[in-house]
Amino acid sequence: MGTLARALMRVVLDSNVLLSALISPHGSPDVIYRAWRAARFEIVTSTTQLDELRRASRYPKFKAVLLPHRVGAMVNNLQRALVLDRPPTDIEADDPFDAFLLAMAIASDADYLVTCDHRAGLLQRVHIGRTRIVTPVAFCAEAL
């Protein structure tokens, strides 16, 4: 017996993409977030990422640009996504804080991992398993 085909592509969004969607309402990260809200694809997240979003949104550099109620609404919305409780922990990344993103991509068999971070080495990997690692602009051009 074969497995059923997924109806929607699965996408892991780096926390920097999600925060960028809140900061700049007309950029490609916001286009991606709105496309997910319109059910154009499935977001994969984790309890680790939801905690990171809550924590990062309180950083002093974000206080002036992130409204707490918008961050709260995003976290609440993401709790309705595919939330992984404990992604694998044995994944290596150039930036150890990005390992959970790679783990989510592998555990969920995601189609894309979308990141804004050019310095951490995620984009240089190009893919992990079958998951393509791309910028928000590239994701919009390829998938939306």
Put a short name on every predicted segment.
Residues M1-T45:
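Short, well-structured N-terminal submotif of metal-dependent ribonuclease cores
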Residues L13, L84-P87, T115-C116:
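Short beta-strands and strand-loop turn motifs
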Residues D14-S15, T47, H118, V137:
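Residues immediately flanking
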Residues L18-L19, D51, A120-L122:
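Short, active-site-adjacent cap segments at secondary-structure transitions
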Residues S24-P25, S57, R125-I128:
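Short amphipathic alpha-helical segments
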Residues I32, L101-L102:
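Short, hydrophobic alpha-helical packing/hinge segments within bilobed ligand-binding/sensory domains
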Residues R34-T89:
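PIN-domain endoribonuclease scaffold, especially VapC-family toxins
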Residues I91, D95, A99, I106-Y112, ...:
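Acidic, PIN/NYN-like endoribonuclease modules and their adjacent C-terminal/linker elements
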